[in-house]
């Protein structure tokens, strides 16, 4: 069972009584056939639920009102099978607070050249019915997505499925609670921000709990629970000699297990699905949570270090969006560069906390080594390299008057040499279009040093995320040129200034 099983998407057909009962009967019949086929053949993450025809303002308003009140409804897919005068939709759309997708399709794929008549034309009017619906959306400044294609087309299926992921993610975000264990890393700017504005814009709440509250739960974990989790470690990872039974770091592994169990219990009891820690606020914990954080991220929790609640929330959001897709999603940081003409590379990592969902190894190494900051005992961590191939890194920043999402498309590559003295998980990539352009654009746009790294999601997913939340997006990819990028930032400043 996944998070998508908790939601459904309503399929709404727009028409009108002008065409008579027989036409509406055929419209309903077609809709039932299309919904059944999409549910069985399209591999959609959510179930489509067909709703009664929307043929009058009252019917349409009732559908939209019911969608708002139904917690299982993640959004609406609307198909204008016939012409549906858009003034009928104004009241409904004005109150709708769920994501909206217009599926611009028709029942038949090919025209029946020899038999087409006006009855056929009146029944199959998506071509201009969809334009009428599009006008009222534009007139009302209604955020909605559009997918064009025949309902049997696999590309249309993929695009509808991607939109469903966004719709479910938006509903989950409205309920998301972010727990900060301690505050931000002192004097750091980009990890701070306006939590009230974030809750108004996205819906997630951010609050702080003293590390001592967590420590109480950690200290209450039983030895039996620790032993059971250690057994799981033994079967899931390759333990170094120091971390095995009788190894000189075995107790550190046990303490890491205690912290993991305590953190998970605390998060579950509080209904949290994202959290932060900071190495400057560990009072009462024996080590910086490393292994615990890595494993919790793999279970779907959002996380970021140094109190970075925006990145923690973004990671949770992207984890939900990518549920069931191939490839992983992780907290990440641009750590250091490899400058070589024609082969500039970025080595991404963090002190400890990289999610094993992006690991290339089936069984990562579990090790305990010294950590030079934090002033605590040596922490346990998983060490691995990252899968290769196309990926993205994304950052959500607070500009005071708005949020900006930055996305850099990257190509993850195999590490050309072993890293015998680097005791942390890492990812190596080429930034698009090249490192100088990508880094300069990122810096000019104010991108954070913390990011969410994903093999599972792509630029289209993040564009749709920005659209569905009505936030600015700045894209850095192979098409990026710095003069045009700077111009886009200036234009955005004016555009969003007028939107205030």
From Swiss-Prot:
Instruction: Name a GO CC annotation attached to this entry.
Output: cytosol
User: This protein's superkingdom?
Assistant: Bacteria
Pathway per the UniProt entry: Carbohydrate degradation; L-arabinose degradation via L-ribulose; D-xylulose 5-phosphate from L-arabinose (bacterial route): step 1/3
The protein's UniProt keywords, in alphabetical order, are: Arabinose catabolism, Carbohydrate metabolism, Isomerase, Manganese, Metal-binding
State its Enzyme Commission number(s).
Answer: 5.3.1.4
Q: Which chemical reaction does it catalyze? A: beta-L-arabinopyranose = L-ribulose
Q: InterPro entries from the xrefs? A: Ara_Isoase_C, AraA_central, AraA_N, AraA_N_sf, Fuc/Ara_isomerase_C, Fucose_isomerase_N/cen_sf, Lara_isomerase
- Which protein are we looking at? L-arabinose isomerase
The cofactor remark states:
Binds 1 Mn(2+) ion per subunit.
Give the function comment from the record: Catalyzes the conversion of L-arabinose to L-ribulose.
Single GO term (MF) = manganese ion binding
Provide the cofactor list for this protein.
Mn(2+)
Q: Which residues bind Mn(2+)?
A: 306, 333, 350, 450
**Which organism does this sequence originate in?**
Salmonella dublin (strain CT_02021853)
What assembly does the database describe for this protein?
Answer: Homohexamer.
The biological process GO terms on file are: L-arabinose catabolic process to xylulose 5-phosphate
């Amino acid at each position: 069972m996944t998070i998508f099983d908790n939601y459904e998407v309503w399929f709404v057909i727009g028409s009108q009584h002008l065409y008579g009962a027989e036409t509406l009967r055929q419209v309903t019949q077609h809709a039932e056939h299309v919904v059944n086929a999409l549910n069985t053949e399209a591999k959609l993450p959510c179930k489509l639920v067909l709703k009664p025809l929307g043929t009058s303002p009252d019917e349409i308003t009732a559908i939209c009102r019911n969608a708002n009140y139904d917690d299982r409804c993640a959004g609406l897919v609307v198909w204008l099978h016939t012409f549906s005068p858009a003034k009928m939709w104004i009241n409904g759309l004005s109150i709708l607070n769920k994501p909206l997708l217009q599926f611009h399709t028709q029942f038949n794929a090919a025209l029946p050249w020899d038999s087409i008549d006006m009855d056929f034309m009146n029944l199959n009017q998506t071509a201009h019915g969809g334009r009428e619906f599009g006008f009222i959306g534009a007139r009302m400044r209604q955020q909605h997505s559009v997918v064009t294609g025949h309902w049997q087309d696999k590309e249309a299926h993929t695009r509808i499925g991607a939109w469903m992921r966004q719709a479910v993610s938006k509903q989950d975000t409205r309920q998301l609670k972010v727990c900060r264990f301690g505050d931000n890393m002192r004097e750091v700017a980009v990890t701070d921000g306006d939590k009230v504005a974030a809750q108004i814009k996205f819906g997630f709440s951010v609050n702080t709990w003293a590390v001592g509250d967590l420590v109480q739960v950690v200290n209450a974990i039983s030895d039996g629970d620790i032993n059971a989790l250690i057994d799981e470690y033994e079967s899931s990872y390759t333990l170094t000699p120091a971390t095995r039974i009788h190894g000189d770091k075995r107790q550190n592994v046990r303490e890491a297990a205690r912290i993991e169990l305590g953190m998970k219990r605390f998060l579950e009891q509080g209904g949290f699905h994202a959290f932060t820690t900071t190495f400057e606020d560990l009072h009462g914990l024996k080590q910086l949570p490393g292994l615990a954080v890595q494993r919790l991220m793999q279970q779907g929790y959002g996380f970021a270090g140094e109190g970075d609640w925006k990145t923690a929330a973004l990671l949770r959001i992207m984890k939900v969006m990518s549920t069931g897709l191939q490839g992983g999603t992780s907290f990440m940081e641009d750590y250091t560069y490899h400058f070589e003409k024609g082969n500039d590379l970025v080595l991404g990592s963090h002190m400890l906390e990289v999610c094993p969902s992006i690991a290339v190894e089936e069984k990562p190494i579990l090790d305990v080594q010294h950590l030079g900051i934090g002033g605590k005992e040596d922490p346990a961590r998983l060490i691995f390299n990252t899968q290769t191939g196309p990926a993205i890194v994304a950052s959500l920043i607070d500009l005071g008057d708005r949020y900006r999402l930055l996305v850099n498309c990257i190509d993850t590559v195999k590490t050309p040499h072993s890293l015998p003295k680097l005791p942390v998980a890492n990812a190596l990539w080429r930034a698009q279009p090249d490192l100088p352009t990508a880094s300069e654009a990122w810096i000019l746009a104010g991108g954070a040093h913390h990011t969410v790294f994903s093999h599972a999601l792509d630029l289209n997913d993040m564009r749709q995320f920005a659209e569905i939340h009505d936030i600015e997006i700045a894209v850095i990819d192979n098409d990026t040129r710095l003069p045009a990028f700077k111009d886009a930032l200036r234009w955005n400043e004016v555009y969003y200034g007028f939107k205030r």
